Amino acid sequence: MPTIEQLVRKGRQAKPKKSKTLALKGSPLRRGVCTRVYTTTPRKPNSALRKVARVRLSSGIEVTAYIPGEGHNLQEHSIVLVRGGRVKDLPGVRYHIVRGALDTQGVKDRKQGRSLYGAKKAK
């Protein structure tokens, strides 16, 4: 326990915050190539077939990324943009694919909350 005098002289040292998205290497987004596109099941108590992809990033690291929205056009060798953000019920999935960027099409017929899904305004 430091004395008041020691705290006045040195102060407290803040612990460095650990990044949750190490594969992005400090970038907000990274480009990558899909190596495998598949479905996986969430952990209890949920039940579904979640769409995910293994992506080799431009940083050289291979990660598992979630494909949000209903329906997608991704296959092996598709070029995608990856952002951080985990999926709570899929263990090991800590990244999201950005819809409407590079080879990924936006979600079709989406009317509300379009921004996150790369959907254009309906005419």
From Swiss-Prot:
Q: Where is the composition biased (Basic residues)?
A: 9-20
Q: From the Swiss-Prot or TrEMBL record, what is one GO molecular function term? A: rRNA binding
Query: Which residues are annotated with the PTM 3-methylthioaspartic acid?
Result: D89
Alphabetical UniProt keywords? Methylation, Ribonucleoprotein, Ribosomal protein, RNA-binding, rRNA-binding, tRNA-binding
Q: Where is this region: Disordered?
A: 1-21
Q: Which InterPro entries match?
A: NA-bd_OB-fold (IPR012340), Ribosomal_uS12 (IPR006032), Ribosomal_uS12_bac (IPR005679)
> What is one Pfam family matched by this protein?
Ribosom_S12_S23
Gene Ontology biological process: translation
| GO CC, alphabetical | small ribosomal subunit
General function of this protein:
With S4 and S5 plays an important role in translational accuracy. Interacts with and stabilizes bases of the 16S rRNA that are involved in tRNA selection in the A site and with the mRNA backbone. Located at the interface of the 30S and 50S subunits, it traverses the body of the 30S subunit contacting proteins on the other side and probably holding the rRNA structure together. The combined cluster of proteins S8, S12 and S17 appears to hold together the shoulder and platform of the 30S subunit.
Kindly give the HAMAP family that the UniProt entry links to this protein.
Answer: Ribosomal_uS12_B
Q: What's this protein's family per the entry?
A: Belongs to the universal ribosomal protein uS12 family.
Q: How does it assemble?
A: Part of the 30S ribosomal subunit. Contacts proteins S8 and S17. May interact with IF1 in the 30S initiation complex.
Q: Which named protein is this?
A: Small ribosomal subunit protein uS12
Give the species this sequence originates from.
Bifidobacterium longum subsp. infantis (strain ATCC 15697 / DSM 20088 / JCM 1222 / NCTC 11817 / S12)
Q: Which gene encodes it?
A: rpsL
